[in-house]
From Swiss-Prot:
Organism of derivation: Ureaplasma parvum serovar 3 (strain ATCC 700970)
Name this polypeptide is given: Small ribosomal subunit protein uS19
Disulfide bond is among the record's keywords: no
InterPro entries recorded: Ribosomal_uS19, Ribosomal_uS19_bac-type, Ribosomal_uS19_CS, Ribosomal_uS19_SF
Highest taxon of the lineage: Bacteria
Keyword RNA-binding part of the UniProt annotation: yes
GO biological process, one term: translation
Keyword field: Ribonucleoprotein, Ribosomal protein, RNA-binding, rRNA-binding
Any GO molecular function: structural constituent of ribosome
């Protein structure tokens, strides 16, 4: 279900501060965040985020195709292990 247009896009204010600081600096250190609900904006392109999946932080490199999506979409929380085949 998509977000209402009258509400607008959402990004955590502390995450926006970190992005502005990263864009101003030369170092390309990953930005660690727990905010999976934040939407990806155009000024995030080219940055690397460490998104928490509930257990560990997964590195996500943001490209232009990701704009408008949420950070959490690129850090899966569940890992499916294949069903074992019955031995005969």
């Amino acid at each position: 279900m998509s977000r209402s247009l009258k509400k607008g896009a959402y990004a955590d204010p502390s995450l926006l501060k970190k992005v502005e600081a990263a864009n101003a600096s030369v170092s390309k250190k990953p930005i660690k965040t727990w905010s999976r609900r934040s939407q990806i904006f155009p000024n995030f392109v080219g940055l690397t985020f460490e998104v928490h999946n509930g257990k560990t932080f997964l590195k996500v490199y943001v490209t232009e195709d990701m704009i408008g999506h949420k950070l959490g979409e690129f850090a899966p929380t569940r890992n499916f292990k294949n069903h074992t085949e019955a031995k005969r």
